[in-house]
């Protein structure tokens, strides 16, 4: 990963990273890195789901759903925050205001017109992605 290349191998001068990776890099190598966070960023929330067919075949439907529900519990949100993942629970996020910038303006996909608009504008042939990479 890019984080590994910079942090462990010393390759590169600047890294754009997930928030938690930046915090972990600073924690693992105090004084070696500086985090410069933008005032505006994109709220990226990778999806989590139970894959019904797989869970049914393995007989793990109940425990899978319990785990999924637990991820959003107060206890799990605190564990996430302690590992530098931004909690989705606002009250718990505020408990970790010494770690997370509560004033950062976080944009969602809706702020960019939704997935269909983003796909068309940025990733379709001739879109922003192609122009950046000279395609």
Named regions from a protein language model:
Residues 5-8, 31, 50, 63, ...:
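A near-ubiquitous, low-amplitude feature marking generic local secondary-structure context
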Residues 7, 19, 25-29, 52, ...:
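Sec/Tat-exported extracytoplasmic proteins
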Residues 55-135:
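Extracellular/periplasmic juxtamembrane helices and adjacent flexible linkers that interface
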Residues 3-4, 19, 45, 64-68, ...:
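Extracytoplasmic/secreted envelope proteins and their assembly/folding machinery
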Residues 8, 15, 38-41, 57-64, ...:
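Solvent-exposed, acidic/flexible segments
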Residues 1-38:
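Ligand-binding pocket segment of bilobal, Venus flytrap-like solute-binding proteins
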Residues 29-61:
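Periplasmic-binding protein-like
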């Amino acid at each position: 990963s890019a984080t590994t290349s910079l942090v462990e191998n010393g390759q590169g001068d600047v890294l754009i990273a997930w928030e938690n990776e930046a915090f972990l890099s600073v924690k693992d190598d105090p004084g070696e890195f500086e985090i410069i966070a933008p005032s505006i960023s994109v709220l990226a929330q990778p999806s989590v789901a139970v894959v019904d067919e797989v869970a049914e075949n393995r007989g793990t439907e109940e425990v899978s759903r319990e785990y999924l529900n637990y991820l959003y519990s107060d206890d799990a949100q605190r564990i996430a925050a302690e590992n530098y993942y931004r909690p989705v629970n606002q009250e718990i996020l505020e408990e970790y205001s010494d770690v997370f910038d509560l004033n950062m303006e976080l944009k969602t996909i809706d702020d960019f017109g939704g997935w269909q608009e983003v796909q068309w504008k940025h990733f379709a042939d001739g879109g922003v992605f192609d122009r950046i990479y000279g395609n």
